């Protein structure tokens, strides 16, 4: 399928065929394709939980208010954010960045580029992503507003702003996963209606992660898609300047 065909094929499917199982390895491959999605500063602060155990799926369905999509799902994938891992991920990104500079940059420019990478990932990232009862976010906000009086600067740096950044990055991975599933001939239904505490309990998730999306997966039944696709007029959403 072309990209346009994949996009048109992807729908939020509410009812899956119980007679058509999914190949778990294909679903796993679609999750691996999701790792190709871009994330802010390449920190990749998300994880995916691929659930095939029927007992756990029943618990997840209950946590998702027993919607038909989860009750009829063949498998369920849960995407979560892991903002608390920013230090470990920044360290890994920095290490690879330094090695890449050594491999591909001219010798006379390596020191300067390594210093720049180190400043960003070892100093700036920890400062931007650190949390402490909203206080660090307030400090960053005040600094940003002050600097912004003299030059352009990113102003969305509060703790709640950074939480949004992490969820946006995870959302890009979720969309990539759904499109990969569509290409494979599988269907999904992105859910935001769930009891996050019950989802975390069912998956034994650490307290500091957050649920971004629950995606029941399967192959659609004829009644699985509710109605024709509706989109607002393109002219209302497109602005050319």
Where are these regions (language model features)?
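Acidic, surface-exposed loops and disordered segments
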Residues: 1-241
């Amino acid at each position: 399928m072309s990209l346009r065909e994949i996009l048109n094929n992807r729908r939020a499917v509410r009812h899956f065929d119980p007679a058509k199982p999914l190949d778990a390895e294909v679903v796993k491959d679609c999750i691996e394709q999701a790792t190709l999605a871009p994330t802010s500063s390449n920190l990749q602060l998300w994880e995916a939980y691929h659930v095939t155990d029927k007992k756990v799926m029943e618990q997840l369905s209950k946590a998702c208010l027993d919607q038909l999509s989860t009750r009829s799902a063949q498998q369920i994938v849960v995407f979560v954010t892991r903002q608390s891992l920013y230090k470990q991920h920044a360290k890994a990104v920095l290490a690879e960045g330094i090695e890449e500079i050594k491999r591909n940059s001219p010798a006379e420019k390596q020191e300067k580029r390594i210093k720049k990478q180190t400043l960003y990932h070892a100093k700036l990232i920890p400062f931007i992503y650190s949390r402490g009862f909203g206080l660090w976010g307030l400090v960053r906000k005040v600094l940003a507003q002050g600097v912004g009086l003299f030059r352009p600067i990113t102003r969305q740096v509060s703790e709640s702003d950074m939480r949004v950044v992490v969820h946006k990055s995870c959302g890009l991975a979720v969309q990539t996963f759904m499109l990969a599933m569509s290409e494979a001939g599988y269907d999904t239904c992105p859910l935001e209606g769930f009891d996050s505490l019950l989802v975390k309990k069912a998956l034994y998730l650490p307290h500091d992660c957050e649920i971004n999306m629950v995606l029941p997966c399967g192959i659609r039944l004829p009644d699985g898609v509710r109605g024709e696709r509706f989109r607002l007029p393109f002219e209302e959403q497109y602005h050319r300047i």
